[in-house]
Amino acid sequence: MSNRLRKITKATIQNDLITLRVNDAGQIEHLSMKDGPNVIARPTGLFRAILKTGENWEDVVFADRQWLNVSVSGHSVLISCDKLRTRDGERGIALRLTIRLEGDRLVFESMVSNSSESTLNEWIYPCLGTIDTLSGGKPDLLYPKHLGEKIKNISEYLRGRTDRDATHEISHAYPCPLSMQWMLLEDSGTCLYLSGRDTLFYTSALRARGSKEGGVTLEMNKMAFVKPGETWECPAYLAWLYEGSWMQGAREYALWAASWRTPVTPRDWVKKMNGCFLVINRQQYGDENWPYDTLPALYDFAKAHGFDTLGLYGWYQNGHDGSRPGPKVSLSLGGEKTLKENIKKVQGKGGRVTLYFQGRLMDTGSDFYRETGRKIESKTRWGTPYYEYDDKYCHSDYLHYFSKKPFAAVCPSCEEWHELMARHADWVYSLGADAILYDHLGGMTPYPCFDESHPHLMDKPSLSHAQGRLRVHKKIREQAERSETCAYMTGNVTDAHSQFPDCLYCAGSFPGIKGTGTSLPVAGDAALGNTESPGPMIMPDLFRFTFPQTLITIRNPNPSVSRRLANFALLYGFKLEMELRNFTDKEFILDDEGNEDRLYSRQLARLRSAHGDYLLEGRFLAQEGLTNGNEQVKAALFERADGCKAAVLWNDTDEDQPVSLSLEGARWNSWASPEEEGSGIPALIKPQGAMLIYEA
């Protein structure tokens, strides 16, 4: 629509802290702090919408093609339109948008009234940009993929993304693989924080959109599915332009999350746990490596690595990822009596035992699926299940390439599944296990379910997943609480789901390229150690600082723990993990390979236990208030219950590095590494060394 048809309007709201101006096209053309520069380089459309009209699932609404009314009321900008226009015509859908100034924050609210025959499937609002710089530099994007990433020079990174499926943009779903509903631009001490305020946890997406010209726009997408005749109010969003650190944004998000997130207090033994020694007793393809009577010997291997918990996968009749969700105790592995006896033997040695169950997928060849699963599976828009495939193999190319076992994802809104998960938890506890490990319940793809016979909240496909899963968590937690010591663990990390388990496994984070922390997929200068090169870097601090009391293991599908992985886990407060998954791993452990790694892992576990008030039960503070004069040495703070702080250091290089660390008020006079300890603060930290600096 040409500008000559618009009523020219400039809507400005401001106070002593923030100025915002919206033009007649509904674009934010000015956003600044008091006396600061305008961070909007080129205004962009404030919203988009994706409609389903007839058989067209991409009937797109662009903000700059609408006839908008823009006005000011007090400290709010009001934007409205009575009809939406797409390239195919006019739709009877009305919008009412509000941008409200609250102190130094901006609150974005919106309402959609649908009197058309279309369904508004996706509502993309707000779109904040285009931003070239916040304070003269090249902004980095802090993005909550898994535990967190920092994407250096996000504008240049997006400019270089020319692949067909993600041209000049990144976008992922929440909840999972995104762990939180906030992201942040950081530029030389200036931050722009954008956060969702969605306590229903709609299936959503967070996008950073660039272009071949550069710049970045931050966007939020809510999968709304607003049907004909429905009026829908979108959960609010909050934007905050401020001077300071990303940690202020994290604290703001944590404060809001405290209004709905009530995490359990983990069992004492889980808090003090150093690591999980995972074993697949029987594989999907039928190979049996570890009968039940080998559990005490397996625990001895675990102790040799400094681990205190034995986690059993594939302990049931059909093997790991064999028959989901209804396994039986394996007769060929020894039967129920032998399983119970050997669990007790491990516990008699001071160990703990967890038993694995699948919490989300159903084997399409199982009796359960044929009798019940078809009714409760999550359905696509075509009415078919959401299929996933899994292959397990060791030496066989056939199993690797041509034996993908199909599974159907359950719709977690179905009560039948809640009851089944609770019964399975009861059964596992009756076998004498200390914990049940329910796979996938902490996250995984939040599929919208289109089976209208299921009891989805508000009849929304996008509320079928998270809302149903929250009820599953509560059911399982009820079973665990019947005992004073039984624990509940699950995989994957999200803010919504991490409040129920005692511990999460499979952190989705790893050390990255040595000396840089750069993610492995990044090539070019980043792979050579140039950390200024555009691209993603691992930043587990993002989730760990926001929710420091959440206990997490570091995913490690290998039969040993490398020195770098152990140091990485120490730095970020992850519990260790390793896995024996096939016959090759069995040979590795029986042949006594990996001696150096095993010794170091055991020494590191002793260090953690000796200083467990910091390293196992303390609060992770990232680098808050810490001055580190050597960026080659990674550092993080931990706070124990009495408020004292200690620092963990890791030299992820191949050379000695000087230690230059200070914290106001700290009286550090001692240090300890996995191999040795001493007084004072050492001048150097050795290559691939880690240490704790603390007050004795």
Features from the language model and the residues they span:
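Conserved, mostly hydrophobic/aromatic
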Residues: L17, S110, G229, A302, ...
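C-terminal beta-strand-rich structural cap/linker in extracellular carbohydrate-active enzymes
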Residues: G678-A696
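Active-site-adjacent "subsite" loops/lids of carbohydrate-active enzymes
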Residues: D287, P291, T338, R352-L431, ...
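Solvent-exposed beta-strand/loop surfaces of large extracellular or lumenal domains
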Residues: Y202-V216, N669-L684
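Conserved structural scaffold segments of CAZyme catalytic domains across common CAZy folds
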Residues: K83-R85, G89, S118-P126, G148-R370, ...
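Active-site-proximal substrate-binding groove within the catalytic cores of carbohydrate-active enzymes
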Residues: G229-E230, C234, Q467-P674, G689
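Polysaccharide-binding and catalytic clefts of secreted carbohydrate-active enzymes
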Residues: D165-S171, L178-S179, L185-T190, D198, ...
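Polysaccharide-binding surfaces and accessory modules of carbohydrate-active proteins
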Residues: I8-A11, I18, L31-M33, N38-T86, ...
